[in-house]
């Protein structure tokens, strides 16, 4: 199983993906290098997408391992559009096509309200920015060929969220 957790900042991705990883016994991967560069700067992200992510997909396919991602290529699709930064659209399409072919699934954690919520690292990602990012994730669901679950997280009920995801995976 290849399962990616996505969504605007402060939507519970890390907590939910960690809990599901433990519950299912599937390793979880989060690229901790994503915060080494300014998120408005395209160089790190476009290079990671073009070279790192394509190699990672080859690895997963060749060793046939299960993995849960805490952010992956959908973040590049969304945030490159949000910041107006350069990306590699051809590679985004190829990665999405390949992962869809491999049966990958994406859980997008979203809120119905972002009022009073602000990113903990970047103060300019405030409620208004999160609403725009959320709308881009909605656009992503129409673009991707992967199976997608929109998980509403306003109640912050981890037990319900894990149950809903596990039922969706089985369907």
For each predicted feature, which ranges?
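Walker A (P-loop) ATP-phosphate-binding motif of ABC ATPase nucleotide-binding domains
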Residues: 2
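Hydrophobic anchor at the beta1->P-loop junction of P-loop NTPases
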Residues: 5
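Conserved substrate/cofactor phosphate-moiety recognition/catalytic segment
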Residues: 8-11, 15-66
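Surface-exposed cleft-lining segments at the edges of enzyme active sites
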Residues: 32-47, 74-87, 122-124
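Well-ordered, non-membrane alpha-helical segments in soluble/globular domains
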Residues: 47-56, 86-95, 126-136, 162
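Conserved P-loop NTPase "ATPase switch" module shared by AAA+ and STAND
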Residues: 65-77
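Conserved phosphate-donor/acceptor-positioning beta-strand/loop module used by diverse small-molecule
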Residues: 69-72, 89-120
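NTP-dependent small-molecule kinase module
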Residues: 124-171
């Amino acid at each position: 199983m290849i399962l990616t957790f996505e969504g605007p900042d402060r939507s519970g991705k890390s907590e939910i993906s960690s809990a599901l990883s433990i519950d299912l016994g599937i390793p979880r991967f989060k690229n901790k290098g994503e915060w080494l560069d300014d998120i408005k700067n395209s160089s790190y992200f476009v290079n990671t997408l073009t070279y790192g992510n394509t190699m990672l997909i080859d690895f997963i396919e060749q060793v046939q391992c299960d993995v849960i991602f805490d952010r992956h290529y959908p973040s590049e699709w969304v945030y490159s559009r949000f910041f107006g930064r350069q990306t590699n659209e051809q590679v985004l399409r190829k990665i999405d096509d390949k992962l869809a072919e491999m049966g990958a699934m994406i859980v997008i954690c979203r809120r119905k309200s972002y009022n009073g919520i602000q990113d903990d690292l970047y103060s300019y990602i405030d409620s208004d920015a999160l609403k725009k990012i959320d709308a881009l994730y909605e656009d992503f669901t129409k673009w991707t060929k992967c199976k997608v679950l929109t998980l509403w997280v306003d109640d912050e009920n981890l037990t319900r969220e894990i149950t809903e995801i596990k039922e969706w995976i089985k369907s």
